[in-house]
Amino acid sequence: MFESHVFSRSTAHSAVLYWDKPAAAKAGAQYTVYLDGQPVATCGRTHFTLTDLRSQSDYQADVFFGHQCVGSCVFRTTPVKNRLDVTEAPFWARGDGKTKNTAALQRAIDACGAGDAVYIPAGIYLTGALRLHSNMELYLDEGAILQGTAEIVDYQPRIPSRFEGTEMRCYSSLLNLGTLDHAAGPNCENVVIRGKGTIASGGRELAEKIIADEQEHLKDYLAEHAALVAECENERTIPGRVRPRLINMSNCRNVWVHGLTLKNGASWNQHMIYSDNITTDHCRFVSEGVWNGDGWDPDSSTNCTLFACEFATGGDAVAIKSGKNPEGNKIGRPSAHIYVFDCRSTAGHGICLGSEMSGGIEDVQIWDCDLTNSWSGIEIKATPKRGGYVRGVSVRDCTASRLLVHTVPYNDDGEAAPRQPVFSHLSFERLTLTGRGLRDGSFENVEPIELAGFDTPGHELRDVVLDGITVENETGTMTLPVQYCRGLTIRDLTCAA
């Protein structure tokens, strides 16, 4: 993972521990957690939450897999934060579901120092775009709903952002962290967004309003560039690129999102661009009915960890990205050291790498995920125009509808990169593939495995391992389509009726 094998995120009285899955551990492995030398729990997942801790105190946690020490970490709990209740003086927000609270909430956020936490109690707090800053915490209590409006005006001004791999000005997101600069490091850091409540935006209604407004604004451009529009997924693609996210992080470092329901962004729900050390855990992502409504999207970002989350999305549950075509190649900031484990999909497209991957994607580790109820399962994709690479991917002990490594034709507008992409060094171990994809609430039979590289010599799919794969279907037989591939190893492939 990073420099050791056990990591922590702590509050005043609790700590979430998480660790890399040992190479010898298979599905159902058990771990013993020690705190200051004493065993406190046995668990079957690669994370555990410690509770009833003392504030401002140092602890050592050790994790064992059998007799093997997975690793240790020393952590310190935080001080008890000073609570800035948004419903009290001098903020006076009203959680009645009717009052627009943008100004009141922003005042509380602006007043929040490193020793404070903006506290949102139960209620529905209608708001427009909000702007967070370094060294702050936002806490939503149980029953608290931070509800973004469905009005375009509440997401002004447009801000520098990146969407589907291209930098552009997009509407402000509901929560905005940092300022986009592909040539710089972090300008927003040490932010905690947590609690038991819900952060929701205007979803499909807001998305449709923005697309219609942008289509009118761009009607002459779209008419003059019909060939460009034809290269897109559909006629809404270009107008839809200015939609806000639910949570947008640009040039951020050390952000923790924990315990929340993240719901109905007008496009993607959590988008991290040029960011580092982002942890999201124990969250629920909901965006069914929102076109292109991805869940968790690291984009030219590093050291991003996602675990113990559930997805019911209108797009990919997870989409790992790094820019598009020549711009992405030139900026050249890869997404790397991405870890996804113990996540579950109930609707949506699954876990995807690409298709915007021109800056490169490397060191992606996925384990213990259930993507049975998804359309694409586990997918690595790009168009021939992209350039760049995907390499060093490991997927272990997962169940999915299917496994796809292939080229795709959509989102293919714009100038091509000087060379085709390369997918290489991909390992898939102990997967169960159902061969049934979930789309629009119904299951369809799909090819359980597709492997394809690119047709230019030197850009074939390289060094792929399929080990311990079980394919389920009604007949007990299958085909394995392989195209433009060099160095494919297959061990213990089982086809079961």
Describe each PLM feature range:
Residues M1-A497:
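Extracellular/periplasmic carbohydrate-active domains that bind, remodel
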